[in-house]
Amino acid sequence: MNVKFFCNRGMNLLEYQVNEWIEVNEVEVINISFCTETYGYSTTYYCSVLYK
């Protein structure tokens, strides 16, 4: 199973939670939110992850 993150560069995946799990064109896509430390504080980003 290959996992590909569609997010900005320079983000460290510290923790994440699954918000949504859907199938698009026979490809499973989940929307997750995760926290990354940038300049001393944590920020939550949202992105999609493809599982093949």
PLM regions: where:
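A short, exposed loop/beta-hairpin motif centered on an aromatic-Gly-Thr core
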Residues: 1-10
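Short secondary-structure junctions
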Residues: 22-30
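Hydrophobic beta-strand residues in large extracellular and virion-surface proteins
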Residues: 29-32, 49
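Short, solvent-exposed loop/turn elements at beta->coil junctions and helix N-caps
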Residues: 33-39
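C-terminal edge-of-domain segments
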Residues: 41-52
